[in-house]
């Protein structure tokens, strides 16, 4: 089962870069609900295109949460794929330094943070939706306020995590390969 998925994912590299470009070129500071929700709209369009069921969980002050589900084996606890759509960059940053790519590297607001992880999670969901074969359901949870401590989405995250067999957060490592294990302060 793994080989067709890997082959398909390898064929999707251009589409992955296109989705990353689209996400990076949307200003999405944590306090810019409209911008964070525009990133969500782009992701839900991706899910619609791949016929992946999803729902938007409205949150008043910060970006809404998005939950996408790919069915798996009956009765098994889901695998949770987490990611956040917000960045620390002020609104207007995209105009100063939009997405670019050179020599196999991408640049722009959110590229060294979570936006590539959103692409990874979206394509994992799409691959397993297309090919099936995962023994557990997959749940993608895409929140909008992580950079400020998840004040609005914490309850949503906790509820999904409590149901899950395990959870993955696809936030990248530092350029050194070190990983972040906690927030500052």
Please give the residue ranges for each predicted region:
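Phosphate-binding glycine-rich loops and adjacent basic patches that engage nucleotide phosphates
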Residues: 1-11, 81-90, 115-120, 168-181
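Acidic/His- and Gly-rich active-site-bordering loop/insert found
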Residues: 2-109, 129-130
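Short, hinge-like loop/turn segments at secondary-structure boundaries
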Residues: 74-75, 98-99, 157-159, 184-185
């Amino acid at each position: 089962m793994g080989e067709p998925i890997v082959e398909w994912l390898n064929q999707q590299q251009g589409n992955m870069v296109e989705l990353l470009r689209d996400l990076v070129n949307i200003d999405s500071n944590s306090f810019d609900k409209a911008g964070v929700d525009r990133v969500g709209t782009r992701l839900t369009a991706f899910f619609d295109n791949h016929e992946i069921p999803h729902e938007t969980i409205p949150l008043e002050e910060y970006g809404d949460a998005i939950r996408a589900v790919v069915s798996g084996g009956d009765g098994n606890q889901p695998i949770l794929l987490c990611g956040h759509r917000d960045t620390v960059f002020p609104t207007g940053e995209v105009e100063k330094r939009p997405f670019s790519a050179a020599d196999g590297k991408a640049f722009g607001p959110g590229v060294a943070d979570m936006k590539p992880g959103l692409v990874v999670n979206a394509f994992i969901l799409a691959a397993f939706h297309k090919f099936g074969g995962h023994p557990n359901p997959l749940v993608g949870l895409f929140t909008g306020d992580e950079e400020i401590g998840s004040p609005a989405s914490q309850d949503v995250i906790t509820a999904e995590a409590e149901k899950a067999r395990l959870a993955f957060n696809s936030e990248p490592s530092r350029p050194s390969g070190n990983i972040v294990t906690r927030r500052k302060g």
